[in-house]
Amino acid sequence: MNTSSSFAERLIRWQRQHGRHDLPWQIKNPYCVWLSEIMLQQTQVATVLDYYPRFLEKFPTVQTLAAAPQDEVLSLWAGLGYYSRARNLHKAAQQVVGQFGGTFPSERKDLETLCGVGRSTAAAICAFAFNRRETILDGNVKRVLCRVFARDGNPQDKKFENSLWTLAESLLPSENADMPAYTQGLMDLGATVCKRTKPLCHQCPMADICEAKKQNRIAELPRKKTAPEVQTLPLYWLIIRNQDGAILLEKRPAKGIWGGLYCVPCFETLNETYVYAEKLGIVSDDLSEQPALTHRLTHRLLLITPFQTPQRPSENLSDGLWVSPEHLADYGLPKPLSDYLNRPQPDLF
């Protein structure tokens, strides 16, 4: 049996019988496909299912997204993480409107010119929205290919990755009409059956042709990437309220943690925290240290110490915004800050 030729046939048949068919972005609309693909980068489907409909309701077309203020986009994105995706999403929408007349291009190379769209994302848009014979190669797909074809190599080696691209391209079905089912099948198989741990080999349509299974190498393929060391980063928050109880927020720099979101004044050293407070007329003795909280990012553990104060600085002492508690949800806040401010606050008076 020709494993390569039977791979696509098996996958398409399996997807149509057992794959996921109720995802809201499974429509021939390149805007919806693109939006979902960006959201799904490093984010679980279950999480995206919560954000996607709200985002689409607010921005039903690429034109409405392009015309929106970036702060509005970031506000809706808050909690999804990897905020550069939201900034790139906004820029890409403006590119589609400005450079392509508001119509998504159907060629992969053109799609790759959009901010935040790489080869695999562009291929997914081509396959789902335009039935183009373009292959995706995300983490789930790499795992499927490495196991079915017993491909062993350093996942961080560019030559090995290129060999997987070549393999993936050779497996594409011959009929353009099969591309949506084939592409969704790759995603579904990797996400629900050929899982990283505890794969469900008895449910896999490739079980009898899987080389890793024959060689008893399922657990070792694909090789694991060398995980970077998780670094602990201390942060200090200043929770400052004015006479009306509004909270001081500042916009974070575009680059770095929570880039572009609104946050309370946030610092990496205690000294910076004290210096900033003094500029607002708040002496360090009037800062009340609260119990620290932690928040895990991909390769960082944030150790956050909030400081509250009973002092009420003058509003003209800061370039930030004073936002009443009932309007905090209108701003894109980092999730740990949003969670913290929704807790019962200490009585300092």
Predicted feature residues:
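Intrinsically disordered, low-complexity, charged terminal extensions of DNA damage-control enzymes
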Residues: 1-21, 26, 191-349
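Catalytic cores of DNA base-excision repair glycosylases
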Residues: 3, 8-202, 206-215, 219, ...
